[in-house]
């Protein structure tokens, strides 16, 4: 058999599809990398929508960027990508076959809502009488049995919680069915088993935050103002239970003195049997302490009790020094008792300082910096995928193959093989996608689809009709800028025929609405006043193209970085500057003309400069992908 026939034979047996289990930031990144590389991707998520833990965060370290601002474009891209099939409310039951030709056995749970009919109007949730604890807000408030996880979730389709639905449990109610204008409720929906053929599997199920309720001396669950770090993220978030206002749970008063306690659920064999460092807790505590001051009305005291500050990442030490310069107090101590403050509010903390003095100090709130543990379903997932776990129930991987599981053709990324922060998780996700793509190089493009290029409308001779979309960005912009006043001002500008203000302009529902408005209003210029074009411009341009508009008829005003952030304590100046930025963007939009991009032939040959371990690994993986590669070493 010739080598050409051998390749053909291999291609016939290799499936050009990959299953990614887990819809957090790592799973999303792996799915996008593979889908953009010519593979069909099944993105499997056990909850009703993708986003994972990152969607719950207010900000990300070390830059303190808005977490949703970074995540939302990726959510929308995942949802609209023609080579990614989202499979929500679905779990992996087993994997049979061998690398290159697996059969994944999936268990899909009922949503009780037909996603092809649901218009996400929210009437089902509004009319639903059943309230349950809201897991997305860490149990700090309530949601309905008919719900979406959060406002920017993808797919933006409601689901009915069968474990709490009155009709499913007791045979009464059906209010959601009665009021649904689209007839999307389907109580006949059943659990089903689905088999899909894939060539490789990537496991990105995320992690579980350590539950400190078993450590009674912290008072968690008994003292209202002792909260976990994830609960505190939801307190700070503009989409959280307190709408971004700094408040303690006991009486919703603004705390003036907050303590963070490090290494809860980490670095302790005796207390929790987790001897490892969770690697993210030091930095997220610093981030929370610094960001709390921005949410406070003033006079906030922040104290971080620690054993060691492990600020090991890029610019992490700078963030640590910056926090100290801003007045965050760092105490090397391990508090050993917590009791409720006067009238059950606040927390009295007893500790011994570095000089050996015993101190009792009253705080308005205590935040437990909980560590990262393996997902609760790690054992079941490992058995289904046929891989091994380590003693902490993380996926067992080699130090020299950190994304390769013990079974050939199965890869892991994110925090499933051990605690990681977001940048590390994204790097691991791309590495896992690269490895999977290398395995399936013979079948690249076999199952993927290319979008049809739609001709843009010719608006070159039409008078400008500008649409201006003003983003609140949660509280990132609206917490400082009077967005209603800016929106009203934009409507008075020459050429503007439509204005709108949205909570998150980058969310899927607003993107769909934007495309609809472009068609209905005949808009031929678009201005978005939001955050940075570096991350969001491509998203809005894709929406314009989908609506039949040339993507270069777009202008963006960065009223977050250039107004609300730099004038955080000067709302009047921030609002006036936002008006100026919008006026400038509209003036420029009036002068925009459609542009076309030339098509260039691609030379599919790679050059790697540097023959160290990184360069050699990159060259080997590129060649495994089927690309001729030159490696240069001086």
Predicted segments — roles?
Residues 1-634:
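Residues forming the flavin
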């Amino acid at each position: 058999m010739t080598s050409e026939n051998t390749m053909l034979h291999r291609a016939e047996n290799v499936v050009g599809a990959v299953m990614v289990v887990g819809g957090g930031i790592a799973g999303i990144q792996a799915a996008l990398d593979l889908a953009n590389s010519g593979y069909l991707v099944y993105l499997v998520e056990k909850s009703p929508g993708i986003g994972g833990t990152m969607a719950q965060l207010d900000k990300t370290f070390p830059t303190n960027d808005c977490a949703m601002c970074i995540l939302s474009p990726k959510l929308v891209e995942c949802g609209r990508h023609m080579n990614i099939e989202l499979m929500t409310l679905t779990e992996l039951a087993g994997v049979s076959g061998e690398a290159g030709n697996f059969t994944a056995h999936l268990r899909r749970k009922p949503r009780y809502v037909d996603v092809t009919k649901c218009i996400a109007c929210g009437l089902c949730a509004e009319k639903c009488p059943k309230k349950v604890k809201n897991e997305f807000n860490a149990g700090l408030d309530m949601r309905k049995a008919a719900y979406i996880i959060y406002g920017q979730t993808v797919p933006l389709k409601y689901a009915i919680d069968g474990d709490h639905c009155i009709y499913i449990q007791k045979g009464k109610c059906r209010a959601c069915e009665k009021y649904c204008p689209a007839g999307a409720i389907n109580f006949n929906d059943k659990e089903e088993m689905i088999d899909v053929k894939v060539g490789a599997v990537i496991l990105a199920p995320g992690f579980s935050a350590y539950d400190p309720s078993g450590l009674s001396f912290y008072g968690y669950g008994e003292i209202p103002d002792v909260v976990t770090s994830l609960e505190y993220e939801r307190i700070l978030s503009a989409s959280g239970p307190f709408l971004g206002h700094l408040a303690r749970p006991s009486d919703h008063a603004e705390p003036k003195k907050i303590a963070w306690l490090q290494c809860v659920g980490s670095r302790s064999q005796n207390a929790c049997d987790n001897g490892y460092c969770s690697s993210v807790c030091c930095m997220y505590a610093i981030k929370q302490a610094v960001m709390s001051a921005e949410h406070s009305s003033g006079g906030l005291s922040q104290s971080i009790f620690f054993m060691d500050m492990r600020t090991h990442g890029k610019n992490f030490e700078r963030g640590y020094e910056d926090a100290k310069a801003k007045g965050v107090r760092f105490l090397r101590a391990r508090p050993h008792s917590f009791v409720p403050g006067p009238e059950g509010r606040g927390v009295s903390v007893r500790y011994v300082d570095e000089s050996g003095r015993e101190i009792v100090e009253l705080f308005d709130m205590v935040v437990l910096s909980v560590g990262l543990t393996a997902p609760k379903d790690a054992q079941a997932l490992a058995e289904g995928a046929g891989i091994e776990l380590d003693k902490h129930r993380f996926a067992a991987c080699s130090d020299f193959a950190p994304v390769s599981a013990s079974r050939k053709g199965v890869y892991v990324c994110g925090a499933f093989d051990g605690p990681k922060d977001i940048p590390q998780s994204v790097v691991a996700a791309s590495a896992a996608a690269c490895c999977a793509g290398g395995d399936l190089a013979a079948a690249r493009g076999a199952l993927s689809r290319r979008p049809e290029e739609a001709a843009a409308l010719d608006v070159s001779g039409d008078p400008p009709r500008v649409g201006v979309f003003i983003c609140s960005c949660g509280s990132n912009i609206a917490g400082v800028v009077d967005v209603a006043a800016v929106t009203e001002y934009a409507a008075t500008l020459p050429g503007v025929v439509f204005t709108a203000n949205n909570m998150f302009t980058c969310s899927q529902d607003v993107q769909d609405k934007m495309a609809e408005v472009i068609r209905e209003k005949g808009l031929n210029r678009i201005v978005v006043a939001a955050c940075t074009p570096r991350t969001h411009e491509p998203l809005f341009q894709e929406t314009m193209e989908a609506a039949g508009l040339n993507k270069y008829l777009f202008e963006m005003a960065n009223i977050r970085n250039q107004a609300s952030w730099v004038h955080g304590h000067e709302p009047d100046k921030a609002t006036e500057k936002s008006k100026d930025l919008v006026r400038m963007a509209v003036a420029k939009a009036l002068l925009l003309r459609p542009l076309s991009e030339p098509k260039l032939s691609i030379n599919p040959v790679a050059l790697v400069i540097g023959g160290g371990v990184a360069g050699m690994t990159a060259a080997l993986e590129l060649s495994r992908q089927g690309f001729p590669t030159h490696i240069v070493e001086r």
